[in-house]
């Protein structure tokens, strides 16, 4: 059986926790058009990582077979 291919775009966007059970992603809406967004919104609510929802986690794992 041939090796499974990893989707490279997904590999750059998702990381796994140390235990390998959960998948993290970067929060959206922080690339451009930032001048009208408040500091509280940009730095507190949009900073850091968040978990991928349970509904999407199965699709992400299919894209990244060797997580």
Curated annotation (Swiss-Prot):
Gene Ontology CC annotations of this record: cytosolic large ribosomal subunit
Any one GO BP annotation for this protein: translation
MF-aspect GO terms: structural constituent of ribosome
Record keyword Ion transport present: no
UniProt cross-references to InterPro entries, sorted A to Z: Ribosomal_bL35, Ribosomal_bL35-like, Ribosomal_bL35_CS, Ribosomal_bL35_sf
Origin: domain of life: Bacteria
Record's keyword terms, sorted: Ribonucleoprotein, Ribosomal protein
PROSITE patterns membership: RIBOSOMAL_L35
Family: Belongs to the bacterial ribosomal protein bL35 family.
HAMAP family given in the database record: Ribosomal_bL35 (MF_00514)
Name of the protein this chain belongs to: Large ribosomal subunit protein bL35
Organism this protein belongs to: Rippkaea orientalis (strain PCC 8801 / RF-1) (Cyanothece sp. (strain PCC 8801))
């Amino acid at each position: 059986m041939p090796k499974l291919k990893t989707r490279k775009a997904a590999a750059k966007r998702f990381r796994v926790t140390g235990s390998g059970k959960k998948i993290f992603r970067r929060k959206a809406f922080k690339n451009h058009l930032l001048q009208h967004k408040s500091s509280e919104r940009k730095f507190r609510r949009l900073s850091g990582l968040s978990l991928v929802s349970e509904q999407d986690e199965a699709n992400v794992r299919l894209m990244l077979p060797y997580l």
